Amino acid sequence: METFSLKDCSSVASSPISSPNISTLLKIKVLSWSKETGLPASVHVRVCNKSFNLHKSLLCAKSGYFKEREDQLSEIEIPQEFPGGAETFEKIMLFIYGCPTLIHPFNIAGLRCAAQFLEMTEQHSTGNLCERFDLYLNQVVLQNWDDTLVVLKKCQDLVPWSEDLLIVSRCIESLAFTACMEILDPERRREKPVIMLEGMVNQPWEYTNIERIINQDTWIKDLTDLPFEFFKKIIGSLRRQGMKERYVSPLVALYASKSVIPEGQTNTDILQRALDLLLTRDKAYRFVPVGFYFACLAHNLKHDTVLKLQDQIVSLLHTAQPENFIYPKAGNRQVAFSQELLTMESLFSVYVSTESERHLTSSSSNVRVGKLWDIFLSRLPYDQEMKTTRFIELIETVPMSFRESHDQLYLAVNAFLQVHTNISQEEKGSICSYLNCQKLSQEASLELVKNEKMPLRLVVQALFIQQLNTHQAFKDCSDSFRFTNSADFSGSVVPSSRPLTSQQSPCTDDETGPRNRPLCFLMQKDATLDEFESTSFRIHNLEEQLVSLKKSLHSHDNLKKPNCLGKRSASRNKNTFGQVTTACIGSVSFTSQRKYANRLLQILRRVNLFGSRKTNRSKAGESER
C-alpha cells in the first residue's frame, strides 16, 4: 500500500483550490490514528455498496447514531436513504478524524443532512458538525444570492431531509426577501425600471420577446430556472412578504411561458400547475397580457383550466393583437369546424353576449373587438369546403354595430371569394350585403371598384358614395370662402389678405384620417396643397371685386340730389371706382345699368370658369391613373 504523510493530508485537505481524493485522505487518517493509538479499526461500515474500516471509539464520541449501535456486531449497514451517499459519508468521517473538511455551497446541504442523520449534535460533542454547518449556512450562504440559489438547487436531491431541517425554507425566504429589495430599491428603480409586461400588450407573445424580458433581470432569470416546487414556494413567500401582484403575476406568466414556447418543448404538467398559481388569484389577470392566455389555450389542458383561461381572455379581448390568435393550420380541409376556429368563435360570442347584457354596444372596446374579429376572418386559410352559410354565420358572430369601419370586413369577404370562385351571384350578393360602402375608406373603396370578384351592384354603390363625397367636399370648400357679414350680397365678410393655412382648410386631412377624404383628393393628394393655395388666392381676388361692385351699387342708391324729383335730365358724376352716381334712381340710363350688369356677369363667368377648370383637372388626373 502506498504511504502518505500526515503533513500531505493536512495541506491538501485545507487547500481551497485543490480537489483531494476523499477516499485516499480518509484511509490515511484511519492508518495514522491506528499508529498513534495502537487501536485497530474495529468497525466495518457499509454505505451504498462501499465499505469503510473505522474506529468505534471515535464514531461513538461524535455520533449519536453509532453510539446507539455500540453493542451491535462489528459490521454496520447504513440505509440506502442516507443523504448524500458514500461521498458525503467520507467527508463526515474526515471531520471525525480531525482532518479539515472543505465546505462550500455545493456540498453544505448534503453535509448538513448527513450530520443530522448521524445525530452529530451538541448533545454528543461540543462544536459538533450540525452546529458548524448551520453557522455556515446562516452567516455565509444566505447572505449571498448566488450561493443561496446553489444550495437550494442541491436540496432537490435531499428531500425530505432538506425540508425537515428547514434548509429549503431558509433559502426560499432569503431569495424572496432579496427579490423584494430589488423591486423596492429606489436607486435601482431610477437606473433600471422594474420589469413588467405592459410592453408586451402590443407585441405577439413569442419566444424571442419572452426570452429578452427574462434576460433583462438576473433575479427573474434565476427564479424562472428553479424547479417548479421551489418556484411555487418562492411565489408564496413573495406574496407573504408583501410584493404586489403586479410584479408577482408577470413572474408566474414568464415561468409558465418557458414551458410553452418554443413549440415542441411543451411541458403540459408544469404549465397546468403554473396556471393554477396564477388563475387562483383575484384580479391577477390584469397584469398579464392576453397573448399569454392565447398561447396557453393552444395546448392540451384540463377542461376547468381551459374555461378559466377563456374567462380571462374574454375580459381582456379588446387588448389582444391579431398575432396572438390561434388559427387553423393551412391545408386543413375542415377549417369551417376546426377546433381553433370554434374556440375563437366561442370567445368572441361570449364577449358579445357579455357586452349585450351590459348594454354597451358602441364603446371603443367593442369597436376594437369588431375590428379584431374581421382581421381574424381575413386571415383564415379558407377552403372550398366552407359553405356560404357558414361564412355568414362567422360574419354575424360580431354585430354590425361593433363595426365603425368595414375595411377589414371587405378583406375577409374578398379572401372568401378568392377561394370560392364558382358560387352563384345570389350567394355572392348575400355575402356582400353586409358591406356598407359608406363605412369603407377611400383606399378600400378604390380597391373594391377595381375588384372583379365584387358584384356590379356593390361597385355602383361605391362609385355613387364617392361621387357624393366629392360633391360634398367641393361644397364645403366653396362655403369656406364665403363672406358671412354681408346681408345684401352673399352673407360673407371681406377676408384678410392672408390666405388660409393648411390647418384651417376644410380640404385637408383632419383627425378623422383618410377615411373621410373624397376619392378625387386621394388621386390628386400630391398636388392638393399647391392647388388649394392657388385657388384660395384667386377666389380672394374675385370676392374683393364683388364687394367693390356691391359698395358701388349701394353708393348709387344712396346719393340723391334734393331737386331730382322734378327733373328728367340728371347730371352724372363718376366716383373713384368708375361707377355712375345720379341725382335720382329714375334718372339712370339703361346703358349704364347694362354696363354694371355686364361687369357682374363677367365676374360670375370667371368664378364658373374656375370651377370647370378644377373639374377638368380632376378628370385628367383620373384618366392618367
Swiss-Prot record:
Pfam families from the UniProt entry: BTB, NPH3
Record-annotated NPH3 domain positions: 217-469
PROSITE patterns: BTB, NPH3
SMART domains reported in the protein's UniProt record: BTB
Annotated ranges, domain BTB: 41-105
Alphabetical UniProt keywords: Ubl conjugation pathway
GO biological process, one term: protein ubiquitination
Chain intervals for the UniProt region annotation (Disordered): 494-513
InterPro entries documented for this protein: BTB/POZ_dom (IPR000210), NPH3/RPT2-like (IPR043454), NPH3_dom (IPR027356), SKP1/BTB/POZ_sf (IPR011333)
Biased composition (Polar residues): 494-507
Domain of life of the native organism: Eukaryota
Pathway membership, UniProt: Protein modification; protein ubiquitination
Record-stated family: Belongs to the NPH3 family.
Domain statement: The BTB/POZ domain mediates the interaction with some component of ubiquitin ligase complexes.
PANTHER family, per the entry: OS12G0117600 PROTEIN (PTHR32370)
Functional note: May act as a substrate-specific adapter of an E3 ubiquitin-protein ligase complex (CUL3-RBX1-BTB) which mediates the ubiquitination and subsequent proteasomal degradation of target proteins.
UniProt name for this protein: BTB/POZ domain-containing protein At5g48130
Organism: Arabidopsis thaliana
